[in-house]
């Protein structure tokens, strides 16, 4: 979480003059303390608020399972109904495509006794022009990367005659899944605008590209990263029932009984269970929102959507803090008479920045001062730095506690259908994502909310565990447990 040094102000050249800092004069001299007090009041998450969020999450889940479009939560069927058992043997691969890089992973499985014998992975950067090119160009590039990865094995691994290598495909874009190994791309996100893929089966696109490369590989499982995390964690621990990713974005999935999913219309899996991807970022019921949240949402590319994600995930926490500080600067002269225009730049203050400020234990909060100056171009004394840390803590506390309430909502929904099968025994929630992994205060607030909602005794049965990079291995394991051979 290093913070790069940036100049103090945006420089704007004037004709015939040297560039000089552009400043904005504060609008009034209102005291800053009432702004903080009001913010803390609006962001407060006492037990009744947490309970409402958990109850509403469970109700929205139930409505989303009843019928497609029944609630804000899509409750997407993963078609994963065969879970890794530990008996899987052989060589399996995973391909993780979710951003500007893709990752290839090879996993050698040795069955019950040896489990995961070896893993190797490689990361490849996708050239920017391919993010705006054709479907064939993108998938050919990915297949070429897979072929190069396989070539480096140098004949070390041999498959029985007539068998193809099997791959689990983690595809973190909106997909309408139609089976364990097929899914129709709904739309590209995350800066991709590839032509010729929307409405097509992404597994077919990859399989065809691998054939063009002469690669003896085929996709056995298509999963999103949250489902992969659950499968990867469950391989080691049968008590894993829920997986949550808290990173730039957020999602949660869980193990559900197929007989309580009305929209399945009687289709049952062989195991009687499946993994449901909640798509909980779209949840919005009863959240404690502020003017800063509403303004940020209105200015976003998807106003009115993904409200839970905008309140709890790493993409947005730093931006909410920036908006609060800007108001304090303009209305209360927090940083003196003038305001740096850099502070008016959306998303210039990132969640790693506010995390680094909250880790500063020095007497004069030197790191806080340095980050404020380097990132937003403002100077600060100790009292200002303390105020800034209070703002960070207020936003992060709300985010962590709401995420905890969301987890309890999922557990409540599961408990309603399976009395004492969740709260009556050890239940593990597998967590992954940079926000959860790297922000200790966020982690603490999340766990405190879970304990408050469940009570001390019941919360002892709920284990919240970090499952680092579980989605890649999870995809390979799902390829193994759904092997075509």
Predicted features along the sequence, with ranges:
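ATP-binding/phosphotransfer module of carbohydrate and carboxylate kinases, centering on a glycine-rich
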Residues: 2-165, 236, 293-485
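Short, internal active-site loops enriched in acidic
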Residues: 172-177, 226-229, 433-437, 469-471
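Short beta-strand scaffold segments in enzyme catalytic cores
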Residues: 102-107, 228-232, 243-244, 250-256
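Glycine-rich phosphate-binding loop and adjoining helix at the ATP-binding site
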Residues: 123-143, 147, 175-234, 238-242, ...
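Short, glycine-/Ser/Thr-/acidic-enriched flexible segments
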Residues: 249, 259, 283, 322, ...
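Gly/Ser/Thr-rich active-site cleft segment
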Residues: 160-218, 224, 237-238, 248, ...
